[in-house]
A protein has these predicted regions:
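An extended, acidic
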Residues: 1-127
Length: 127
């Protein structure tokens, strides 16, 4: 494929880093390349602009994704959590892409630990 993925395994040895690396290993044959830009907001913006094809992240803070959610929606893209539900500010993980690429990604990763929800909510009202 000619798919360019943007991701970031997060800083340091945090929960989800190993799962992200496992996900990359599984999806690598379907990619042209993968990039780590270092800014989730910029990465999502690149997907919205069509410069990259898919952005995935295990766990983001609301401030990391707020602008990207709007940009992707306005660009006609699809943004979901790791389970495939429409993304919200406190979503558990993020997948941003076109609907076709999203469907392919979800199929390839359906049995991976990366797709399972985290036990800790990011929403301060639920802690």
């Amino acid at each position: 494929e000619d798919v360019i993925m943007v991701t970031d395994p997060a800083y340091g040895p945090v929960a989800g880093t190993t799962d992200t690396l496992q996900m990359l290993r599984k999806i690598w044959p379907s990619l042209k390349t993968a990039r780590m830009i270092g800014s989730s907001a910029l990465s999502i913006s690149y997907v919205a602009a069509g410069r990259m094809d898919i952005f995935v992240h295990h766990r983001l803070q609301p401030y990391d994704q707020a602008a990207g959610l709007i940009l992707m929606e306005e660009a006609g893209g699809l943004v979901t959590d790791r389970e495939g539900n429409r993304a919200q500010l406190y979503s558990d993980g993020l997948i941003a892409s076109s609907s076709i690429i999203h469907q392919q990604f979800m199929e390839i990763t359906k049995h991976l630990q990366w797709r399972k929800p985290s036990s800790r909510s990011l929403n301060p009202r639920e802690r």
